[in-house]
Every structure is written in structure tokens, then in C-alpha cells.
Amino acid sequence: MDLNKFTEKAKSLIQSAQMKALGAGHQIFMPEHLLKVMLEDESGLVQDLINACGGNVQSISDAVDSAIKKLPVIEGPGSGGLQLSREIAKVFEDSIGIAKRNKDSFVAVERLLQGLTAQKDDTVGKILAENGVTPQKLNSVVAEMRKGSSADSPNSEEKLNAAKKYTKDVTELAMQGKLDPVIGRDEEIRRTMQVSLRRTKNNPVLIGEPGVGKTAIVEGLANRIVANDVPLGLHDAKVLALDLGALIAGTKFRGEFEERLKAVINELSRAEGKVILFIDELHTLVGAGATSGAMDASNLLKPALARGEVRCIGATTLDEYRQHIEKDPALARRFQPVFISQPTETDTISILRGLKERYEVHHGIRITDGAIIAAATLSNRYITDRFLPDKAIDLIDEAASRVRIEMDSKPEVIDELERKVIQLKIEAEALKKESDENSKQRLKKINEEIENLNSKFADLNSKWQMEKNKIARIQETAEKLDNARKELELVQRSGNLGRAGELMYGVIPQLENELKNQEKVTDSFLKKEVTGDDIANIVSKWTGIPVDNMMHSEKEKLLNMENEIGRRVIGQKDAIEAISNAVRRSRSGVQDTNKPFGSFLFLGPTGVGKTELAKALAEFLFDDQSALLRFDMSEYMEKHSVSKLIGAPPGYVGYEQGGRLTEAVRRRPYQVILFDEIEKANPDIFNLLLQILDEGRLTDSHGKLIDFRNTILILTSNLGAEIMLKGNVDSVRNEVMQIVKSAFRPEFLNRLDEIIIFHSLTRDDIYKIIDVQFSYLQKTLAKRKLSISLLQEAKELIAQTGYDPEYGARPLKRVIQECIQNNLAKLVLSGEVVENDELIVYALDNEILVKKV
């Protein structure tokens, strides 16, 4: 027998059957072994053929098992060989004959099954015939399955039912009610149908940003086809989604992929327009399956698409369409673009209302209308790098998931009681070892308290369990109601009016009333609904922008913001007030939403607190002064340094990395940005800042829009510092502003919220700054368990030595470092100072000294 005449699948089954025979200890290879292996085959081809003939796979399998058990078993030496029986040889001979008569080049699996049914006098033939699989029935089923095609390659089985193997039936899913409802999008669905009903090039391609609902439009079309709400040309049409992964998976040799795809195309061509092929991520076809010299999937599809033999709907993003499809004009002209725009906030709210019930059933909670409106508005305002409705749906889903987790977790009051009981039990165990009267009295009191708490815990716990059970029942009823509604749609389509009436007027109203009554029960423990606050909380988690409702403590903190920051930044009341007002405007929601929270130009001599105020603001907002995004503009003096901020242009090194400014803001949209010594920056950088200050956005080198509306921009400059030192701020303001106007363009200055001139520091300010700096030193030493205090005469000497109006507060830091920290370091290293020592800073003979108390 020449195995080369058989397909790869048939060969594999024959070899598996031989192994089965050897494994069972049989020396003769019988048809029973072959049929058993064919029935166990994972591809399911033989099972499908038997079912199509009206046979029962399980009863055939049981009968074959009984027949195999009756075969003689050989043990001992010489039992390892295997011979072909006369019966199996006849099966192969008949199979080859059937294949030749049907003009097949190779013997496929179905021909082997036909060969088995042809053995009318053998055990296998009788088993099959008794179960309804006769040669006549099988021949007609195989002919129907083959649809005139022949086995002309070693992998011909893969061509059979290729559409079923490599596609997913979207209309079938719609019929089963497994697709989410599609709300709106009527114009886009109508346009898709319009293109699909053309005579040639009837292939719409849905082009839109990720998440705008391209796939949903195809699902909406499938729902309409099922509901018969389509033009006559689309009645009884099927929408099949191509599974490119399944098409490519397992293609070991060149040509296998092309063979599979060609089989799908041929099968769709034979459907004569009754099947629409949906290709999600259409751009993946370009280059798919192509090896050196081989054609890719798109080239195989082109002829069928041009002639209108295959009706296709593609979906891809704008970028991918431009990058892959437009590069191939021959492919592009076969598709008709249908542009899918992002829905508006109002449309998104309608979409969410339509989907609400599905998410309520899945999570077993209620979603309020306030949550739906918040999801649409907050996602549109704060999540700028994604698109509606996808981002709004994700917000609803995650907020519902969070509420569900909270429901399943132990309530805080019960958890606290449980911990308290454990704590008291530990204390009671310790007291049992004591014999004095006080301990006995305390033990008695603890036992009473434990008993009391246990009783309280039992009551609350049973109440919680009851509430959980009620919620489980509500979810169960909601699921039953959802399934009843799906069933109603199915029976209405199938014309079973009796069952439809039963569902519509009996089951569904009963379940609705039941659900209403169950939801009436008020609960004290568990939160069962998603509100706008939950959505705001998720937005805050995603973006880091505090959009959730402020706690009372935060409101107090914001109202006293000047005092908080004033403890750290001394002598700059105007600047602190301007910054505080900007933060309050943004958090209270009265800020213009199309520009940054605040943009300020800080002017003043060196060392007066310009950079320190930016750090203090970052610490106030984020409890972390490193949350400040700082750019030293002395690094951006060259013309080409603009690319450091927004990213290198295409073709240059570093293009993939993005810009320092744009990437930082994209990842963390809520932060303080400091441009230090802005006058040193290249003039081109001001052109970038104009866009940020005016519109609150900037486009990076990749073409992505970066949102700066949730940032505070602070620019510092030393311009006019020498004039400020001559007199007070009010008297020199005009002179300083003239210098500023000559350095910066009017359109730049005009876009700033405020230009703040910092005061020179007075001697009183210096004393306060010494206190602030000394408190930092005290905190550092406290970590080493050392305490230090500063005497008044030492403070006055530090102020006298470190005060220089021209240099501001920076000399103070140097004096503290040289006179106090250097002496401290020597004392610590010499061992004179150890843990828990008290130190004092004093002045003697115009010298600042440190000693142990």
C-alpha cells in the first residue's frame, strides 16, 4: 500500500490506528482500530459526517469498543510486530477506488470512512449500517460537503468547511443574543449597507480612531439582518468574521496558508453574495502569510474583491489605513472608505444607557444615570488620549467592578469588631497566667467585653450575610429576566407565537415585579449602586487628576493654602496668594477648561524663593516636592534643543523616545511644571509655550495631542534683578516691566495669567528663614535620635553673617552648613555625640559653635 496516495490527515489517522492496535496487544491491524481513531479525531470531521447521516457517534463508539475487546491479544516474545489484515487492505483498496472515481488526486479522510461503510459483510460495516451510516447516505453527505471540489492536495481536509473553521459567525451570535445592543450609528450602518449592495467593489472599509465603535457597527448590521430590518439584498445574509490567527496557526509548509485562504474565498464565492466577510484590523492582511516569494493575503483577496464575488467589510484605524492600505493603490481602490467619527457626549450617554442593563446583570449592581453622565463628561474632559464611547464604557465597567469587590469584602464595622475581639482574647490569655486580684478583675471584665462584642459581631455578621444573599437573589432574577428577553427575541423570529405570548405576558412581567420587590429592600451595610462619585474616583486613579469630590479636610486645606505655603516660603505674600487662587479655581471647577490651571512669570533677584515656591506648591498638592517637573532653561539655549521637549523629528536619532516635556505630561497630566531661568531659553521655545498657554495643548513629534489643561506652569527669571535691589517693588515695577517687555514678545506676556515680582528679603524675613532652615536640620538629626536648639545670639549672628540683599537667602544656607553642620559632623565622627544627646548652637566671640548640653 502506497501511503503517499493519502492526505496528511489520512496518513496521520492510519499511523495512530496502528499505534492503537500495538498498544492494545493486537498483532493484526483491523478496520475497528481505524474507525475508533477516526471517531476520536479532534477535528470532528468524521463525527460531523456521521451526524449528517443521522447516526449516533456515541453508540457507534461503544459498539467499536466492544468489537476491539473481542480481538485476540498476543503477549510475550514476538508480540511487537503488526500485520495488515485482509479486511483493512480491502478498506484501503475501496477508498482509493472511490477517490479515483471522484477524480481526487489524494485519498482524504471522508474517502476512508466511505471505504469502511463499503464493507457490508464486515463488523465495522455492519456497526455503521445499524446506526444509519449507509454507503448511499454517506455518499450524498460527502457530495454535499465537497460542493464539487476535489482532493487535489495533501491538506485537502483543511479546505472542507473552511469558512466554518477560519471564521466566526457574527449573525449566529446576534441570533443567540450574545452581542451587546448597538445604539445610534444609524447613518454609518445605512452607509455600510449601501456600499455592500453595489454590484462590484461592494466592500466598505470602516475607518476611525481606536474605540469609536467600528466593530460595533458590524455587530449592529448583524443584529439588523437577524431582525430582518435590512434591504432585500441583505435578507438571510450571514456576517462571518475572519479569524486570521486560526488561518495562519499550524501552517508549517509554504503554500498551506494560501491554500486555506483560497478555500475560504472559494467557499464565499459559491455563497453568491449571501455571506459578508468581516475583516477586523484589515491592515493585518497586508503581508500576512508572505514569505520570500509567496503572495500575501491581500493579493489573494484582490481578484475576488474586484469582481464582487466576495462581499467584504473591513475595519481599521486612520493611521493603519494610511500606512498599509493606501500604500497599495490596487487594494485601496477595491474598498470604499466609510469614516466613523467619535460620538458626541450626548450620543455617548445614549449608548451607555443602552448598555447599562448588560453591565448591571454582569456585576449584579445598579448603575445610576448620574454615573452614566459622569462617565461620558469626565472621560471626555480628562482622558484625552483615548476615544468615546470606549473610554466611557471602560469607566462604567471598572467602577462597577470596584463596587462589586467592596460588596463581596467584609464591611469595615464587622472587620473592626473582629480585630477587637482577637486583641481582647490575646490580652485574656496573658492575664490567665497572673494570680493577683487586679489581674483577675481585669480578666473578668475582658471576658464580659468579649461576650458582648461576640454577640454584636454575630448580629452584624448574620445581617451582612442576609444582605449578601438578597443581592445574590437580585442578580439571579436579573439574569433570568435578561435570558427571558433574549428568548423572546429568538421565539418571535422563529414564529413560535405560543411561547412568545407566554414569555411576554407571563414570565417577563412576573420577573420584573419580582426584581422590583427585591430591590425595594433597604440595606444599611452594602453599597449596591455605581454613582457619579465612583466614576470620578476611577478617573482620578487613571489620570492622577483629583476630580472626585473633595473631603471636608481638603476644603479646609485649600482655604488655608496661603498659611500652609507661607510656612515654607517667607516674605512673598503676593506670589503665594496668586498661586493659591489658581489652585482653588481649578479644584472648585470655576476655571476656564481650555487652558492650564495657572501660568505665572516669577521675577526677582536670586535667592528670594522663586524656585522654592514651585517646590512648596508641588509638595502641597502631591505631598511630594519631587512631583515638580523642572526644566533648567540654560540647557535649552540652542535652536535644536526644542526637539528635547517635544521629541526628535522622524528620521532622527531618538524619534521613538518622545519628548521630555510631552512624555512627562502625557503620563502624568496633573503636575506643576517649572521652567527655570526662562530668559536663557532659545526664542523658538517661546513659540511652543504660546500654544500651551493659550489652548492648553501641544502636539508632539509623533502627532499626538498632549493635554496641558491640568498643569500649573511657572516660569522664573532674573530680569531686572539689579533694579529691584535699588528700591521697593512698587517704585521699580514700571522699570522692571520695561526690561521684561524688551526681552519677551507681547503675545507671550499677554498669555500669562500673572507676572509676579518677588520682594527682596528684609532682615525680619531672614530670621524666619533661619527658623525654617533650622527646622530641616532638626528633622534630619531627629532621625539619628539627636535634638538640637538654637540660641537667640547665635540666630542674630547667622542673620548678620548670612544676610546679603544681592544674593537673597542662599548665603544663609552656606553659613548654616559651614558653622553648624561641619561642627556637628566632627562631633558625631569623634564619638563625642551619641544617641539621645541634646545639642545647643551658641555664639562666642563672633563665632558660631555647637556643644553638648
Swiss-Prot record:
Residues given in the record as ATP 2 binding sites:
604-611
Query: Positions of the region Repeat 1?
Result: 6-71
User: What domain of life does the native source organism fall in?
Assistant: Bacteria
Report one GO cellular component.
cytoplasm
Output one GO BP term.
Answer: protein refolding
Annotated region (NBD1) at 161-342
This protein's UniProt keywords: ATP-binding, Chaperone, Coiled coil, Cytoplasm, Nucleotide-binding, Repeat, Stress response
Q: Region (NBD2) spans which residues?
A: 554-760
Which residue stretches, if any, does this entry annotate as coiled coil? 393-524
Binding-site residues, ATP 1 = 208-215
Q: What does this protein do?
A: Part of a stress-induced multi-chaperone system, it is involved in the recovery of the cell from heat-induced damage, in cooperation with DnaK, DnaJ and GrpE. Acts before DnaK, in the processing of protein aggregates. Protein binding stimulates the ATPase activity; ATP hydrolysis unfolds the denatured protein aggregates, which probably helps expose new hydrophobic binding sites on the surface of ClpB-bound aggregates, contributing to the solubilization and refolding of denatured protein aggregates by DnaK.
Assembly and partners? Homohexamer. The oligomerization is ATP-dependent.
Protein name (record): Chaperone protein ClpB
Annotated source species: Wolbachia pipientis wMel
Query: Which lineage do the record's taxonomy fields give for this organism?
Result: Bacteria, Pseudomonadati, Pseudomonadota, Alphaproteobacteria, Rickettsiales
